[in-house]
């Protein structure tokens, strides 16, 4: 503690309060040796570090696949992960044509207004899905947004069965999105890849083609992450 106090130039009493708070959160651990407290990193901090490193690896492995998907569809492509029961976008590939409404990297959205979000929770264990649907309050962004947990559950069953999610203006009027799951080597869904576009280009005639290309991209990404069906 004295070393931390000297290096950070803050009083020992403040250091002690900070360390005890971090200890309660399991980010550090205390080991008394010969009557002196020795502090080291806790398991939760190590888990957090591993989680961030795995996301960095994911972005690196999937980036070329995202670029190819964006080129094939001429649409905006995103990569999202589940974080705090919401979808958090960790990467994207933009096209030259403008898209007025989209989620930036680092932003988080409720799962009911995001195709990626629906994909990420559709494959959760039953008890985890039950908890999420009972605890979350789902916003109604547009008249097309589904907010009822029972209706969402039915939609999620369809997502699981068909292997993709379709957001038809649930996030914003005039915006459509198709997402598919990325699996890791254990068979768990670790991310979702999606194509987003406006009604002007994301027409009804192109939906079937987009579904096929997004699912193909997700399958390629899953193989890169070690998944073998």
Residue spans of the language-model regions?
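Short amphipathic alpha-helical/adjacent loop interface patches that line ligand
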Residues: 8, 19, 45, 66, ...
